Amino acid sequence: MLIKLLTKVFGSRNDRTLRRMRKVVNIINAMEPEIEKLSDEELKGKTAEFRARLEKGEVLENLIPEAFAVVREASKRVFGMRHFDVQLLGGMVLNERCIAEMRTGEGKTLTATLPAYLNALTGKGVHVVTVNDYLAQRDAENNRPLFEFLGLTVGINLPGMPAPAKREAYAADITYGTNNEYGFDYLRDNMAFSPEERVQRKLHYALVDEVDSILIDEARTPLIISGPAEDSSEMYKRVNKIIPHLIRQEKEDSETFQGEGHFSVDEKSRQVNLTERGLVLIEELLVKEGIMDEGESLYSPANIMLMHHVTAALRAHALFTRDVDYIVKDGEVIIVDEHTGRTMQGRRWSDGLHQAVEAKEGVQIQNENQTLASITFQNYFRLYEKLAGMTGTADTEAFEFSSIYKLDTVVVPTNRPMIRKDLPDLVYMTEAEKIQAIIEDIKERTAKGQPVLVGTISIEKSELVSNELTKAGIKHNVLNAKFHANEAAIVAQAGYPAAVTIATNMAGRGTDIVLGGSWQAEVAALENPTAEQIEKIKADWQVRHDAVLAAGGLHIIGTERHESRRIDNQLRGRSGRQGDAGSSRFYLSMEDALMRIFASDRVSGMMRKLGMKPGEAIEHPWVTKAIANAQRKVESRNFDIRKQLLEYDDVANDQRRAIYSQRNELLDVSDVSETINSIREDVFKATIDAYIPPQSLEEMWDIPGLQERLKNDFDLDLPIAEWLDKEPELHEETLRERILAQSIEVYQRKEEVVGAEMMRHFEKGVMLQTLDSLWKEHLAAMDYLRQGIHLRGYAQKDPKQEYKRESFSMFAAMLESLKYEVISTLSKVQVRMPEEVEELEQQRRMEAERLAQMQQLSHQDDDSAAAAALAAQTGERKVGRNDPCPCGSGKKYKQCHGRLQ
């Protein structure tokens, strides 16, 4: 009560921020008459003038009024569109490292041009981040004329582009692209083998469109670049055959309870656990299939990988549903993003889950992957010097934006008052009753010419509603991940009188639904439209537009509540744009996932008490409150998951930044010999210490062990025992110095043979490859540590502290291994004069030809073409990575001269 009173007197923080910014808007408006007088060339020249002022030390913030006035004037001349005052407010919010909440239809794309132009003046680059390639391309092409008019360059960063094209896109003043592509480019740059392969510049300013979708919904999904691990597809197929024999454990109070099942499912945490009965049965089935030996336990350490396969298969069958979590297209399992409803081509679940789903669906199983590099969106976007974002729904997540990204949320007022009617939820007992009520509502609305958008939470549900509408004879369009190719066309015409559109969450974010349909889309469909045709299309559209407004505007129907209130608000936000009329209503049933998992007992008890009849709906503030509480519970749980993920990833992030910083320094220098010499001293000191403890008696020395170690690991055959016999006065310190001097001398002789330049190149390559290889192993080890660390809680230890402690020890051990591996590899390298290599290669060829002739003689009855092909293969075969190296070292090619390929 007191807080409300104080807010009334002093205004909220949001009000105070907007009040301060409105003063700047007044200054911009006052400048407008002067800016209007400038010629096109003078307006364009302002960009160079602003840049010159920045170079002289002027602060960027001082340029805001004039820069925004210039962009507004340029927009009037290029697009015929003038930024509203609220858009100027939005632009200022975005320049202040804040999240701007701007309602649907308020022109976020045009608003973004203001801070993008201002920050591009620094010459450090601006990254505009969108949720998909279509929006990146559309926004870049739409805004390109404006930016180019002002003398700025625009780049588009799309998946699959060659490195030179990407480099060019990043070199532009303003770059448009998707969150995934920016993140993957960052990881790829940190796996490059030469400075020329890198594409990104220093991360300066990111302007994130649909910021809630990217920084919150996708925050639990790390970006991973992976390489193939060993093939275990056969095991997934064999385990998959067993799972249908298991019965799910139902709750004791449920109608389907029939005694103890074989596995229980926790839908909240999305986990599956075997019961005692299930363990006995699955062990019997595994023995019967010949996968496990009689008498063995599934939980024995030897069967840890088998347990991994069983868990993955159980999760695939019990928790992941076709056309909800994934679709099968062209023999491939493609993930469907739970938040946007879009397919995620190229993305795969980890921990063997994707392979288990492939086995379940009977499609080709692709190899498991090993992580080569990974980063979460949370940590990637925190790398930018300056971060800002905009969305139609941010206020519900303001606390998370503030606590994780240190970004304040500012709600920007609408240009015209919002007049949409949000009707109370209707709750039914069963799904069938709910669907029937939705069909009746659609019939009523379309009869009076009102367009309807039906929002569903999955592809499966959208197809269920579509089938019911078809049975009822109602014409409609379906927009989901299966039919997303014509997304823009469907959304553009969803505002037609009596149009019915069914959409998953993808519901055309970034595309406005215009009442009466889009006249621009109709004009674009004509090849060479005349002025008369365009005028007629506009006139027809105006009639339709007025008819839809008279019917009540766009009506939104939600077929069930989403886990997050924000995503429900996004669906509602498709209606009532720019002060238009509109309405919305959510239809729920006790069989909906949210109600079943989080709100079922209380609400169903309430409904039973009210004595509801089939087909009747409940509409009561208590029910609405119970649903809102359920959503808050889920949001709170998801926030905790994301926060915990970030706390663990922060540990890995510190290590990642250290490794990537070291790697980039290594890439940028051409001579690493000083580093190598320093490392060599450390490695030899540690190696000798293991066999000759410092300041110890000679009796404690293990000379044979040291000689063997130096021979095996550093290719140094030193007669240390002989030295000690001949020189009894040889001290420990002198001995250490002699061993190190010998190793340096041997190395220098190799350098003389190949030349200093070649040796420097080789040293750098070995360091990079060894670093990448050990970092990859370290990531896998960190992943294993992370999966089991929660068990430390049972020993009264804090899992997070334990994770920090152990991961630091692992990181320190990895750095020691790096030094050792580099010196060992460089010491073992065999160098020969070019003539010797040529001679060895000649001998190898002759031997190969001799073998080929012998094979031909032993297969004289074979088809001559096959024999010739065999001879060609054997005679001119390239050196395989696991073949002996042709230099004669006796090592595998990949560990010798093939290391740099």
From Swiss-Prot:
<comment type="function">
    <text>Part of the Sec protein translocase complex. Interacts with the SecYEG preprotein conducting channel. Has a central role in coupling the hydrolysis of ATP to the transfer of proteins into and across the cell membrane, serving both as a receptor for the preprotein-SecB complex and as an ATP-driven molecular motor driving the stepwise translocation of polypeptide chains across the membrane.</text>
</comment>
<keyword id="KW-1278">Translocase</keyword>
<keyword id="KW-0653">Protein transport</keyword>
<dbReference type="Pfam" id="PF21090">
    <property type="entry name" value="P-loop_SecA"/>
</dbReference>
<dbReference type="Pfam" id="PF07516">
    <property type="entry name" value="SecA_SW"/>
</dbReference>
<feature type="binding site">
    <location>
        <position position="896"/>
    </location>
    <ligand>
        <name>Zn(2+)</name>
    </ligand>
</feature>
<protein>
    <recommendedName>
        <fullName>Protein translocase subunit SecA</fullName>
        <ecNumber>7.4.2.8</ecNumber>
    </recommendedName>
</protein>
<dbReference type="Pfam" id="PF01043">
    <property type="entry name" value="SecA_PP_bind"/>
</dbReference>
<feature type="binding site">
    <location>
        <position position="885"/>
    </location>
    <ligand>
        <name>Zn(2+)</name>
    </ligand>
</feature>
<dbReference type="InterPro" id="IPR044722">
    <property type="entry name" value="SecA_SF2_C"/>
</dbReference>
<dbReference type="InterPro" id="IPR020937">
    <property type="entry name" value="SecA_CS"/>
</dbReference>
<keyword id="KW-0811">Translocation</keyword>
<dbReference type="GO" id="GO:0005829">
    <property type="term" value="C:cytosol"/>
</dbReference>
<keyword id="KW-0997">Cell inner membrane</keyword>
<dbReference type="InterPro" id="IPR027417">
    <property type="entry name" value="P-loop_NTPase"/>
</dbReference>
<dbReference type="InterPro" id="IPR011130">
    <property type="entry name" value="SecA_preprotein_X-link_dom"/>
</dbReference>
<feature type="region of interest" description="Disordered">
    <location>
        <begin position="859"/>
        <end position="901"/>
    </location>
</feature>
<dbReference type="Pfam" id="PF02810">
    <property type="entry name" value="SEC-C"/>
</dbReference>
<dbReference type="Pfam" id="PF07517">
    <property type="entry name" value="SecA_DEAD"/>
</dbReference>
<dbReference type="GO" id="GO:0005524">
    <property type="term" value="F:ATP binding"/>
</dbReference>
<keyword id="KW-0963">Cytoplasm</keyword>
<dbReference type="InterPro" id="IPR011115">
    <property type="entry name" value="SecA_DEAD"/>
</dbReference>
<dbReference type="InterPro" id="IPR036670">
    <property type="entry name" value="SecA_X-link_sf"/>
</dbReference>
<feature type="binding site">
    <location>
        <position position="512"/>
    </location>
    <ligand>
        <name>ATP</name>
    </ligand>
</feature>
<dbReference type="InterPro" id="IPR036266">
    <property type="entry name" value="SecA_Wing/Scaffold_sf"/>
</dbReference>
<dbReference type="InterPro" id="IPR014018">
    <property type="entry name" value="SecA_motor_DEAD"/>
</dbReference>
<dbReference type="InterPro" id="IPR011116">
    <property type="entry name" value="SecA_Wing/Scaffold"/>
</dbReference>
<dbReference type="GO" id="GO:0043952">
    <property type="term" value="P:protein transport by the Sec complex"/>
</dbReference>
<dbReference type="InterPro" id="IPR014001">
    <property type="entry name" value="Helicase_ATP-bd"/>
</dbReference>
<keyword id="KW-0813">Transport</keyword>
<dbReference type="InterPro" id="IPR004027">
    <property type="entry name" value="SEC_C_motif"/>
</dbReference>
<feature type="binding site">
    <location>
        <position position="887"/>
    </location>
    <ligand>
        <name>Zn(2+)</name>
    </ligand>
</feature>
<feature type="binding site">
    <location>
        <position position="897"/>
    </location>
    <ligand>
        <name>Zn(2+)</name>
    </ligand>
</feature>
<feature type="binding site">
    <location>
        <begin position="105"/>
        <end position="109"/>
    </location>
    <ligand>
        <name>ATP</name>
    </ligand>
</feature>
<comment type="similarity">
    <text>Belongs to the SecA family.</text>
</comment>
<dbReference type="GO" id="GO:0005886">
    <property type="term" value="C:plasma membrane"/>
</dbReference>
<dbReference type="InterPro" id="IPR001650">
    <property type="entry name" value="Helicase_C-like"/>
</dbReference>
<dbReference type="GO" id="GO:0017038">
    <property type="term" value="P:protein import"/>
</dbReference>
<feature type="binding site">
    <location>
        <position position="87"/>
    </location>
    <ligand>
        <name>ATP</name>
    </ligand>
</feature>
<dbReference type="GO" id="GO:0046872">
    <property type="term" value="F:metal ion binding"/>
</dbReference>
<dbReference type="GO" id="GO:0065002">
    <property type="term" value="P:intracellular protein transmembrane transport"/>
</dbReference>
<dbReference type="InterPro" id="IPR000185">
    <property type="entry name" value="SecA"/>
</dbReference>
